[in-house]
Amino acid sequence: MKSLQKGFTLIELMIVVAIIGILAAFAIPAYNDYIARSQAAEGVSLADGLKVRIAENLQDGECKGPDADPQSGVVGNEDKGKYGLAKIEGDYDASKTEAGDPNGCKVEITYGQGTAGDKISKLITGKKLVLDQLVNGSFVQGDGTDLADKFIPNAVKAKKP
């Protein structure tokens, strides 16, 4: 009488587990990088929100305006997001007139100081992204950035010569 084989052998199961382990070895670091990049992108959104404040302050010849005061309705020079804190920094340089020149105003984003607390990726916690505002109003990566290049959003990445 023939016996029918049912199920998988131990060797077959071990091979499947090994394949899953190899796939996970590649997938988990890639996923962690993806999470860090998406969290770092929030900083550029915060900086975009500060553009209006910078434009208002530039009418007074300065990058930074008065500090926040809820009593008087002054919104201040910083914006806190889920993963980071963006602050307006720098000194306005009125001599710059070309659209691609930095105007002296900067936005400094510090990751890990947002409302999410410990839910931020360890790959970007405590890192800074400094954005220089150009005369045309756009932002580009500035000096003082210590965020790894692979996490900097392409929209503001410094152009390599």
Curated annotation (Swiss-Prot):
Keywords: Disulfide bond, Fimbrium, Membrane, Methylation, Transmembrane, Transmembrane helix. InterPro entries: N_methyl_site (IPR012902), Pilin (IPR001082), Pilin-like (IPR045584). Residues 1-7 form a propeptide. GO terms for cellular component: membrane; pilus. The chain crosses the membrane at residues 8-28. Gene3D superfamilies: Glycoprotein, Type 4 Pilin. This is Type IV major fimbrial protein FimA. The lineage of its organism: Bacteria, Pseudomonadati, Pseudomonadota, Gammaproteobacteria, Cardiobacteriales. Disulfide bonds join C63-C105. It comes from Dichelobacter nodosus (Bacteroides nodosus). Belongs to the N-Me-Phe pilin family. The gene is fimA.
